[in-house]
Amino acid sequence: MAYETAFLGASTVFGKYWTKRRYFDYLIDKDNFKITFGRSFGMMVYLDNAVANGPAKVRADVEADTRATNYLINHLADIKPELTVFVTTCDMLPETADENTPALEKSDDPYVQNRINLYRELNRQYGRVLNVHLPEIANPSPDFNPLLATLLNPDQSDSPLPFAPLEYHQLYLPQRIMGDVDRCIPLGIPAIIPAMPPLTTTELVKLLNPALAERLRAPETTDPRGSDRTSIHSFQWLDPKDGYLVTKEDEMELLKFYFAP
């Protein structure tokens, strides 16, 4: 029925957290995905594969990701949601984007192209969509965040850390997702980048595992810049409006609370 709700990706990190705190009529994963076919929903939460399983894990098998993405695209028309909350990555957006920045049309990176394809088709076929673009997920699993995984469980070698020291990271805690989405839905906005203040690799090392600071290598001109995306809707969370949902000081305190020894 049209007032029923569904969560696609219920057994994932985001899904477990969200569905334990909010009731959904249908908890969907790949094993029972077909039961959504032919149904209408008042609201559906839809997790992109990279958000559900981790960007690093998905990148490790892009062919499987392409098959999964194409399967989902081919069956979008079989599901009829009134409102779709699509939780995806920022890979289809430039590194300094906000919600007014057009998404990329194509990419030479097949992983990014899969994100683009599902984003484009879902928004084309469904009428009312809230796109939630996560810059970087603060999950210490190497599938989600190799940097956090290394800082919390480093090897015992003296070799330099395999991360650019000045690269920006915008770490988004999964625990925020339900509250942030609940705040966005009444606004009627089509997209939100829940942007956290950017922290460099060096800042994160000193914050979460200072003993590794001596293993930071020197910066190189070819190093990635990282993410410094902002939100035009940040004033809904924080005043004055600076593009971020929290202050840098609060972000650092939260990361220390969850991840510092």
Functional labels for PLM-detected ranges:
Residues 46, 83-86, 130-136, 193:
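Structural signature of the Rossmann-like NAD(P)-dependent dehydrogenase/reductase core
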Residues 108, 116, 120-176, 182:
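NAD(P)-dependent short-chain dehydrogenase/reductase
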